[in-house]
C-alpha cells in the first residue's frame, strides 16, 4: 500500500466547552514500517466498522471549504502539509462550536490501494495499558486505540476525479451517540449522504430472494447461491470495496453469468451498478434449514418475525405468503 503523504496533528480539547488548542506538525511523517503498519491497521479497523454512510461533497463554500483545499492540493497549488494545516485549523473551529466534542490526534494520509488513490482522515485516541520492559518490569504504556475508531472518513480520490456523477466517493463513520456528537465531523468533511447503504443492501437481498423464487431452485442450490452472495459481499466490506452487480451475478451462476444481473435490470429495482454493502444487514440474511421425516424447511433469517413466526413453547412455525407453486400443488391435492 504505497503511502504518498502522511501527517498527524493534535487538537487538545475536553468535552466541557473549553477552548480547543491546536498543536500542528510542520512537516510530513517520514516513510517507515511503523507508518505502514498504522495505515494497514487503520484500514482494517475502518473497513470492519458497521454503520458507515456514503456520500459526496457539498458544493464548495465557506461552510464546506475542505473540497476546495483538497482540489488545490491535488492540482499542486498547495503541498500536503499546507493542505492538512488549513484543514485541521477548520476542524479546530468546528470542535469549539461543538461542546460535546473531544480532541485527539488527527491523521491525514494520502495513499494508494491497487489502482485507486484515497485520502483518509481520522480522529485517533490513546488507551492506557501496561507493558513489560527490557528489565522485566511492568510499566505503563500508551498506544493508539484503533478499536475505538468513532470519527473517520475516507475519500476515493480516483472516483471523485474521474466520475463527476458519483454520489458515493466518500465514506464516513456515523456517530452512535447522537447528532450533536458527530455532525461537526461530517460538516468538516463537507459530505452529504448520497447512498443509503443498509437500504441498498436490503434491496439487493430482496432482488436475490425474488430471483431464487423465480428460478424455482432446489433447496441445496438456493443455499449455495445465498452463501456465495453473503461471502462475496462480506469480503467486499472487509476490503472497503463496493459490491459490483455484474461480478456478483457471475459468481452466483457461472453457467449463466448475466442471469441475476438481467433479473435486477428487467425488474427495475433501482440499484446502482456498484453498491456499498452494509455488514449488519448482510448478517441478517443467513438461511435457516432443517429436515425431518419427509419435511424440508429452508428460509432466510431476515424473514423470521415477518413471514415466518416461531412459537418456541409450542414448537411450531407459522409461514405466511406461501410460494404460489406450493399453493397450486396443495389446491390440486385438495381437488
UniProtKB/Swiss-Prot annotation:
Transmembrane intervals: none
Pfam families (UniProt xref): NA37
InterPro entries xref list: Nucleoid_associated_NdpA
Coiled coil: none
Keywords: Cytoplasm
GO cellular component: bacterial nucleoid; cytoplasm
PANTHER family in alphabetical order: NUCLEOID-ASSOCIATED PROTEIN YEJK, PTHR38772
Protein family membership: Belongs to the YejK family.
Matches recorded under NCBIfam families: PRK00378.1
Stated name of the protein: Nucleoid-associated protein PP_0973
